[in-house]
Amino acid sequence: MNRLLSLFALGGAVLLAGCVAPTAKPNDPYYAPVLPRTPLPAAANNGSIYQAGFEQNLYSDRKAFRVGDIITITLNERTSASKNAGSQIQKDSSANIGLTSLFGATPSTNNPFGSGDLSLEAGYSGERATKGDSKATQGNTLTGSITVTVAEVLPNGIIAVRGEKWMTLNTGEELVRIAGLIRADDIATDNTVPSTRVADARITYSGTGSFADASQPGWLDRFFLSPLWPF
């Protein structure tokens, strides 16, 4: 009996461990700063007015266009979602069978089990019903800024950026990660771009410590909210 209880406890612990969300780890090489692949050639002083080292247009701004350049992304994300679902199933059935004769003969009305006449009439009725309602709402807001580096410049001029920011506090650590694609036209003169203009954005905000632990439900709550709960 004790061995059976131990097996059930071990199985429950394994199932609950699968409900825990993975925690982001520091020093992910994917979000490491991207440095230029090759050093830029030294500008040749071949004239007092025109020099071959300057490749920018005369009327263009000095923006981040090369691999390894730095861009600041201002985070201004607000999302909200709501979902309602309801279902109701009901089934009623009934049947009555009335017979006055059986094979051409009328049955005897003598009831050996008590008073009253016997009858061939029969009937049944049944009723089944099920009803369910569910509702889920969620809202998130993320504001701030993060400075990333240019990881790649695509042939069509789209710039791929990615980066992360770790903040070590007294009660733990907080992490902000972002990766995505931006247009050169969306970059302001101070090399900033809003997060709403980042295509295919992958934004992660998580943390460790007492604050992060306090915002997580307990293991028993996760069990009741998981698909393992049969009701």
Curated annotation (Swiss-Prot):
One Gene Ontology term of the biological-process aspect is: bacterial-type flagellum-dependent cell motility
Recorded topology in the membrane: Lipid-anchor
Where are the S-diacylglycerol cysteine lipid anchors?
A: 19
Q: Where in the cell is it found?
A: Cell outer membrane; Bacterial flagellum basal body
Query: What is the name listed in the Swiss-Prot or TrEMBL entry for this protein?
Result: Flagellar L-ring protein
Q: Which GO terms describe its cellular component?
A: bacterial-type flagellum basal body, distal rod, L ring; cell outer membrane
InterPro entries in alphabetical order: Flag_Lring
Asked whether the keyword Lipoprotein is assigned, the reply is: yes
Q: Name one Pfam family in it.
A: FlgH
Any GO MF annotation of the entry? cytoskeletal motor activity
Keywords associated with the record: Bacterial flagellum, Cell outer membrane, Lipoprotein, Membrane, Palmitate, Signal
Protein's job: Assembles around the rod to form the L-ring and probably protects the motor/basal body from shearing forces during rotation.
NCBIfam families from the xrefs?
Answer: PRK00249.1-4
What is annotated about its quaternary structure and interactions? Answer: The basal body constitutes a major portion of the flagellar organelle and consists of four rings (L,P,S, and M) mounted on a central rod.
Source organism per entry reads Pseudomonas putida (strain W619)
| Covalent lipid adducts (N-palmitoyl cysteine), residues | 19
Concerning its family, UniProt says:
Belongs to the FlgH family.
Report the superkingdom from the record. Answer: Bacteria
Positions in coiled-coil regions: none
- What is the predominant subcellular site recorded for this chain? membrane
